[in-house]
Amino acid sequence: MGRFSSLCALTAVIHSFGRVSAAIGPVTDLTISNGDVSPDGFTRAAVLANGVFPGPLITGNKGDNFQINVIDNLSNETMLKSTSIHWHGFFQKGTNWADGAAFVNQCPIATGNSFLYDFTATDQAGTFWYHSHLSTQYCDGLRGPMVVYDPSDPHADLYDVDDETTIITLSDWYHTAASLGAAFPIGSDSTLINGLGRFAGGDSTDLAVITVEQGKRYRMRLLSLSCDPNYVFSIDGHNMTIIEADAVNHEPLTVDSIQIYAGQRYSFVLTADQDIDNYFIRALPSAGTTSFDGGINSAILRYSGASEVDPTTTETTSVLPLDEANLVPLDSPAAPGDPNIGGVDYALNLDFNFDGTNFFINDVSFVSPTVPVLLQILSGTTSAADLLPSGSLFAVPSNSTIEISFPITATNAPGAPHPFHLHGHTFSIVRTAGSTDTNFVNPVRRDVVNTGTVGDNVTIRFTTDNPGPWFLHCHIDFHLEAGFAIVFSEDTADVSNTTTPSTAWEDLCPTYNALDSSDL
């Protein structure tokens, strides 16, 4: 594969946290390379997009065609040299080949090569992100924010500012490359907010700063780029009014803390109505060092005119924590199917298990096939029984209602709560974590669900309106690597009529398969 020519110039912007980055898109190059970074004061080699971590913000407008030319310049011997990028939250209708999940939708991009992802944000707007979908590569740095703006946003009258300065990314950061560390790390070394943070026992390095002007209202876009922990997010002295979850508009809901899981996104309106001062932004991880001593797990909300110093504000007990069950979609709120459990065309109960090394769903641990599922289908294999990996493929017909339940017991899913992400769709959560109630009238709708803890039986519903193979997996990346996934093959017989990959896509597998093992 030859390299594609540069598709557009980068427009540099000064982010509110004081570092120069680049807002790019919807037509752009994205160069993946290795480089040393020290976001928390500790220097390590990482996987970078356009030389920065997190990767640059990619933006577009509702209905835009995204053409993102991914150039693989990876060379570090301790990390993978190939890559594959998933555009998290995009439906990819008609472009299943561009979804980016390695060995489900494509072969990886080999080092020294490039690949053009070409897809359209049809009827989609909101907060998205992109990340490597090859092994645990995104834990080493290949992750970044993505926003599709809606010129006719129904919530536009609720805020004054929505731009590059209102992005808030949360990342777990490890001082050891994923391939060299534990299979299941017990907490990260640090929490990074907009790419900056401190680690316990480390120096007082710079914290990210988000600057606001007193009296203005800001649409903050909060993204969890986490590989593992969930976070309890709050801003001292301020409430947050949620208006979006995972690129789905919801009725405004005011909270004072948000528990956010790997892969999830929220937009909330923050009104800068406090005294001119500095306020701690807090992201308490579910594992690792769970305090705020010395400014760890923190960033700074700074009012214009305040001194450039760390805040002195103190943490307060949350009295309005987000209850996911209280989120109501703004449009078409009803869940598909009949208003009772099992009232769908196909109901599937996912039985989890763990043997100390691998996770299992319905007695099968997912192992990536050598031939991508989409390529198998386009090559003529249309029976789920014949598709590989055997036992992990579930065929579902078109225009059907699907219900999935995730029962959690004391032994079947250690490391809970597990955030599960369905590619190619959003879904209605008719039973949320921590509840025995069901809601078929106006349940929260999103693309990553917290499946809860012991005794929970979280249940989701979606409609099969998007032909192709779609991953359903735990978004704790170390758990996905250990087999915690299945694939829905949706309307398999019609995939060849609705999906026409590019010639470059067809070249991916021969190029990748010809690599020496040292260049994978």
UniProtKB/Swiss-Prot annotation:
It catalyses: 4 hydroquinone + O2 = 4 benzosemiquinone + 2 H2O. It comes from the Eukaryota. Residues 24-149, 161-303, 370-491 form the Plastocyanin-like domain. Cu cation 4 binds at H418, C474, H479. Cu cation 1 binds at H86, H421. One of its GO terms (cellular component) is extracellular region. Glycans are attached at N73, N76, N239, N399, N497. It is found in: Secreted. GO terms for molecular function: copper ion binding; hydroquinone:oxygen oxidoreductase activity. Homodimer. This is Laccase-4.
